[in-house]
């Protein structure tokens, strides 16, 4: 799980993909923050080689407050449906750096989760490490 902002580390992404591959785990790359224009476009371009290698790369906006164009809304909705279908009936690990929207999407999938969220630090271009524990959620998808 990565986002257009804060900028993701390709090294961290590659390590996660290698670990998943070594364990026979299907990896899906989710790029969040579709509403961030040029930042999103740059991040999407950086993910093109992963798409060429056969990884599923989905574009979404996890924030219900995001200002999306009608086209972006369609893309986000289609990606969410594709992601939910891929996760249905499976144990899933949502992995990614701080500030990428993992807790935001979990709160939407599990309304009772109450996972705390914050804005990212503009000064540091990173998340504020809001989620400090690992939690197992049951999702009826």
Question: Which sequence ranges carry the predicted segments?
Answer:
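Conserved RecA-like P-loop NTPase ATPase core
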Residues: 87, 105, 137
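Anion (oxyanion) recognition and catalysis
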Residues: 17, 21, 51
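Canonical P-loop GTPase G-domain recognition
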Residues: 36-100
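Alpha-helical scaffolding segments of alpha/beta enzyme cores, especially the outer helices
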Residues: 15-18, 45
């Amino acid at each position: 799980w990565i986002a257009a902002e804060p900028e993701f580390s390709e090294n961290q992404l590659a390590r996660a993909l290698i670990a998943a591959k070594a364990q026979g785990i299907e990896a899906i790359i989710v790029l969040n923050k579709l509403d961030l224009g040029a930042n999103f476009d740059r991040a999407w371009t950086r993910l093109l080689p992963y798409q060429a290698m056969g990884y599923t790369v989905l574009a979404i906006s996890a924030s219900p407050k995001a200002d999306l164009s009608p086209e972006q809304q369609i893309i986000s909705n289609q990606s969410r449906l594709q992601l939910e279908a891929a996760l249905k009936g499976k144990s899933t690990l949502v992995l990614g750096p701080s500030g990428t929207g993992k807790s935001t999407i979990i709160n939407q999938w599990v309304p009772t989760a109450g996972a705390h969220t914050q804005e990212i630090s503009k000064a540091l271009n990173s998340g504020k490490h809001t989620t400090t524990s690992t939690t197992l959620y049951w999702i009826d998808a």
